[in-house]
Amino acid sequence: MATETIAMDWVDIGTNGESRLAYLARPVVTGRLPAVIVMPAIHGINTYIKDVAIDLAKAGFVALLIDIHSPEQEPDLSNAEKIQIAVETLDDRKVLKDVDAAVRYLEQHAAVRADRLGILGFCVGGTYALLAARTPAIRVSVGFYGLLEYQSRTDNKPVSPLDSVAQFTAPILFHVGDKDPWIDSKMLAEFTKRMQQHQKSYELCIYRGAGHAFHEHFRDAYRPIAAQSAWNNTLIYLRWHLCGKRTV
């Protein structure tokens, strides 16, 4: 699908008079299409994550990219310590309410099949993609290297993905590198154990030699082979669960 057939625009998905910005990318075609909510990493909406939304649109999906920092200003991300503070400051309940708002927006959009909604996220957005797998309207969830467990429970982080496995209703595809310092083999083993214990549908893809953020082409962590493989797997998974197709 050529770039010129993709419509891109900022939209407001807010409710009850509250503004919430999101970035919409969709193929310009007749008929209704499946849609994917995109959750960015802590860096928020940048060129990289817009490219992800556009790539989804080129693949035949309506993509709605949530601004996890809206309506507040973007946080200071100038060093690792401040990035960690920004992650800890994000209120999970607020972000998941934004996911609910995105679901309602897409269900009412003329270009969207309301019964074919998925979610995709990266890093902290990958964590939110997993937490949103509890949402009945979400039919599939794909997470790239999202944190599976929290070091502690706080008002902002009351429930981790591991805590939520029993409530998952969507099938899960999870991508992670075997060199990721935030997601070790013990955490993955516990995730697998709980998914199997609760008989949840999932696929776990581990990429040798890849660390955290291996899909993000603007970072030193980028690994092109792992990134392309993970993206191909993502399209296969989304198309199977949202379109009933077995091929990319």
From Swiss-Prot:
Annotated catalysed reactions:
2-oxo-3-(5-oxofuran-2-ylidene)propanoate + H2O = 3-maleylpyruvate + H(+)
Question: What residue ranges are annotated as transmembrane?
Answer: none
The molecular function terms in GO held by this entry are: 2-oxo-3-(5-oxofuran-2-ylidene)propanoate lactonase activity; lactonohydrolase activity
Q: What is its EC number?
A: 3.1.1.91
EC top class named in words: hydrolase
* Keyword Hydrolase set for record: yes
Tell me which Pfam families the record gives: DLH (PF01738)
Q: Give the annotated active site.
A: C123, D180, H212
Identify the keywords attached in UniProt to this record, alphabetized: Hydrolase
Q: Which family does it belong to?
A: Belongs to the dienelactone hydrolase family.
User: What does the protein in this record do?
Assistant: Involved in the 5-nitroanthranilic acid (5NAA) degradation. Catalyzes the hydrolysis of the lactone to produce maleylpyruvate biodegradation of 5-nitroanthranilate.
Q: Tell me what this protein is called.
A: Probable 2-oxo-3-(5-oxofuran-2-ylidene)propanoate lactonase
UniProt source species: Bradyrhizobium sp
